[in-house]
Amino acid sequence: MSELQLIITTHGRKDKQLTLESLIGSGLMQRTTLVCPQKEYGYLRSLRDDYNVVAQPDPNWYLPEKRDWVVKEWVRRGHDKIVLLDDDLRFSTRISKDDWHLRPITGKELAAEFQRLEDKLGPEFPHVGFAQRQGNNTIEEVGWKTPGKQVCMMAYYLPIVAKEVDWGLVVCRGDMCATLQLLLKGYPNAVLTETCHDQREFDAPGGCSRYRTVEMLNSEAEKFVNLFPGYASIAKKEYNKKTSKSDKKDSAIRLELIVQWQKALEEGTRVRKDKQ
């Protein structure tokens, strides 16, 4: 097997490469690639010479289209393990087994955690990742959780994922959609809860915010539920959205997804066994 490749998908955040900053000093830069629109290639290429930059064929792609291309392109390049990363991530880990508080993790210490992902990733667990920071302090015993929710960063074993995931089903929450597709086909994932990630700011300028609206998110949530009846449902959440005036906010209702990951894996395992 080839070494795990780190792929950061980025758009409109040339000066705010938070994920990349966490990797400085990790020894992983040679295996890291930024995938960006052609107009951002020159600037991102000029920042450092120890990572790779690739211009995406279509500058107008939405994130699922870019992820689909990355999966196929890295298969073509002969790789079998990748981790897809959003460009605005920070990483944390438990202070100790007895102290549930989190501390930042970067560089070589973060590299050791990526090695744990690489070691876990393979035919038995073709999709793995770090847990979300939100709610981490409610987990009493940390370690590998199967199944679990994966968003913003997903490590994939390409011989399986490239064949089994359809990235064209939804525009928003494509990471959750990919996880659910794989579980329903009997492929378990593993989420490391000891180390976690979070976004510095939801809907920050650049990235998906250039096309994603509350209306689109809500429409896509309903589409998701219709695609996976019995495994996904909707909960309404009120939050404040920014208006054209930076000092003023409007209240909006966003439809959040509730996904039954365990039920999906149990059904997928049964179906997969029946086919064998």
PLM regions with names:
Residues S2-L4, K14-D15, V170-C172, M176-Q276:
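C-terminal catalytic/acceptor-binding lobe
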Residues L34, K81-D86, P126-A131, N189-T193, ...:
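A structural signal for short, well-ordered beta-strand segments and their strand-loop junctions
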Residues S2-Q5, I24-L34, D50-N52:
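Short loop->beta transition adjacent to catalytic acidic/histidine clusters or analogous donor-positioning motifs
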Residues I8, Q30-Q38, V128:
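Short, hydrophobic beta-strand segments that form beta-sheet elements in well-ordered domains
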Residues Q5-G27, E40-S46:
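Short, well-formed alpha-helical segments that are part of the catalytic scaffolds
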Residues S92-M176, L184:
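Conserved catalytic core of nucleotide-sugar-dependent glycosyltransferases
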Residues V35-L85, R90-I105:
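Active-site-proximal specificity loops/subdomain of glycosyltransferases
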Residues R13, D88-R90, R133-N136, C196-D198:
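Short, solvent-exposed loop/turn segments at secondary-structure junctions
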